[in-house]
Amino acid sequence: MTIVKCKPTSPARRHVIKVVNPELHKGKPFIPLLETISKSGGRNNNGHITTRHVGGGHKQRYRIIDFKRNKDNIAAKIERIEYDPNRSANIALVLYQDGERRYIIAPKGLKVGDQIISGHHATIKTGNTLPIQNIPLGSIVHNVEIKPGKGGQIARSAGASVQIIARDYKYVTLRLRSGEIRRIHSECRATLGEVGNAEHMLRVLGKAGANRWRSIRPTVRGTAMNPVDHPHGGGEGRNFGKHPVSPWGKKTKGKKTRNNRLTDKFIVHRRS
């Protein structure tokens, strides 16, 4: 992994910092594991904007990722590491001994030619997947399930990881990177190691156009608008003299938005 600071040959290149990984596959992705994505532009079926700051961007195809890792007791070899435009983490194409190929999230330290395996009795090794009740305390894991068999939902982005800190008969306690401590069922699966490409956070896009390639449109401040457009709009100067709110008058910047009371009992300590 190399951090490259571009020379200031133009105003757009002056601040660009790239993260270059020479181990990434330079060819095309594995075609049978691709799906088309149609862009919504942030609109719903009525054509109304439901997600602001979305639109345009380069055409992409979705890579079908195996988050469940449920092909047990069949060894697989890492064929190549690839870039995925749909996530911050890199992905790995694995070839199972029975000839099937799947994409997985590429863990840190996993290289081409390495062997991985899933199952209840898999060895404790980076890239292997097994029920979290069979993983030693203190281990670092990623791609953790919340419901058994549903597929990994926690710690899937670049550099993400979770630590196992306690275990009882039916549940395992995890410490998330956010500081939250929560319990999940001991039959849930997790993959050993942390997600690779942690240097993703060091990149600097350098220009607005790089965000537009990623379908991200500009974010206009409420204080820069007129009163008809935003509660913060209008007035002399930049002060709006009230608690920050959304364009629809809902409190923002610190207001709690979580509303899933059924799973509150599994959160031992909220994130700080």
Swiss-Prot record:
Basic and acidic residues bias locations: 261-272
Pfam families on file: Ribosomal_L2, Ribosomal_L2_C
Gene3D superfamilies: 2.30.30.30, Nucleic acid-binding proteins, Ribosomal protein L2, domain 3
UniProt GO BP: cytoplasmic translation
MF GO annotations: rRNA binding; structural constituent of ribosome; transferase activity
Assembly notes: Part of the 50S ribosomal subunit. Forms a bridge to the 30S subunit in the 70S ribosome.
Record-given protein name: Large ribosomal subunit protein uL2
